[in-house]
Amino acid sequence: MKIIGIESSCDETGVAVYDTALSGFAALRAHSVYSQVALHAEYGGVVPELASRDHVRKLLPLLRQTLAEAKLSVEELDGVAYTAGPGLVGALLVGAGVARALAWALEVPAIGVHHMEGHLLSPLLEDDPPEVPFVALLVSGGHTQLVAVDAIGDYRLLGETLDDAAGEAFDKVAKLMGLPYPGGPQLAALAEQGIPGRFCFTRPMVDRPGLDFSFSGLKTQVLLAWRNSDQSDAIRVDVARGFEDAVVDTLAIKCERALDTVACQTLVVAGGVGANKCLRARLQAMCRQRGGRACFPRPALCTDNGAMIAFAGALRLQAGQQSDIAVRVTPRWDMAALPPLVSRSCRR
């Protein structure tokens, strides 16, 4: 099956073609992403109405571009996958509307994909994918979750943030230190120049049982340290380093605790913060020390993209699942409510 995937949940327009007849990363025939960062920069954050309108402008040209790169005509497609949630309702409706219209015109099945399932499955696009069961850390601007993956499509939430997501904390700390939008990646780049230990911030919630996270208190602690400093460039890089180390340590401690909880040695990390170099190195070292394995998508597939939607959609379409003809999106959507790809009774 040749499946086209459409991602439009927030401020990236993504389109990709996945071919189930091929294996490994070669199965991704083409993928294109258009980022709206420049559009939203002057507002310091994503403006939902502007995001929706820009998806309208960019989606059809991106579809044509991606099909051309895949050397396919639209008539050769066997199915359509699209992000149905969670996300911004207007942005989701743009992608869902185009996807449903395309599927109807081609008389092929369509499937609405959970955005975070797309992220979770993105490391499986690589040539040496992880095998289930595994623990997944989903870490982005909107989510920080630990999920036990007993089988593809069978997910148990182990823990999540009680307030700010890790990526959101990165962006907010960057903003309070005067870095331009989007600040998270710039903060991480500054942290590489900082001196470890110059600023030592709390590792939140690691001193209590459980697998939940909280980053709002850490954000406030960094704010106070910054305000009480001379706010020089030298201090900025050291504060950035201290903050990043605190977040990375917290995520690593909770990931190891999650692996122990489910007696598993494979960790999958996905989402925008999964591209962070310090986090990757720390989690890889932790898993190696345990005799396990940490798996990541390549950095280009950590941010929102159509490839993960095409892949996740292909798995569900191959399992015989499809969405009805109505254009429906789910801005808030619990991943544990997704139907399994294989009956749970068949796996016992």
Swiss-Prot record:
Q: Give compartment(s).
A: Cytoplasm
Cofactor binding note from Swiss-Prot or TrEMBL: Binds 1 Fe(2+) ion per subunit.
Q: What is its main location?
A: cytoplasm
What cellular component GO annotations does this protein have?
cytoplasm
Could you tell me what reaction this enzyme catalyses? L-threonylcarbamoyladenylate + adenosine(37) in tRNA = N(6)-L-threonylcarbamoyladenosine(37) in tRNA + AMP + H(+)
Recorded GO MF terms: iron ion binding; N(6)-L-threonylcarbamoyladenine synthase activity
User: What is the enzyme's class at the highest EC level?
Assistant: transferase
Q: Which cysteines are joined by disulfide bonds?
A: none
- What SUPFAM superfamilies does the database record attribute to this sequence? Actin-like ATPase domain
Q: What is its EC number?
A: 2.3.1.234
Q: Which InterPro entries match?
A: ATPase_NBD, Gcp-like_dom, KAE1/TsaD, TsaD
Pfam families with a match to the protein in the record? TsaD
PANTHER family registered for this protein in UniProt: TRNA N6-ADENOSINE THREONYLCARBAMOYLTRANSFERASE (PTHR11735), TRNA N6-ADENOSINE THREONYLCARBAMOYLTRANSFERASE, MITOCHONDRIAL (PTHR11735:SF6)
Q: Which NCBIfam families match?
A: gcp_kae1 (TIGR00329), T6A_TsaD_YgjD (TIGR03723)
Which family, according to the similarity comment? Answer: Belongs to the KAE1 / TsaD family.
User: Which protein is depicted?
Assistant: tRNA N6-adenosine threonylcarbamoyltransferase
Annotated source species: Xylella fastidiosa (strain 9a5c)
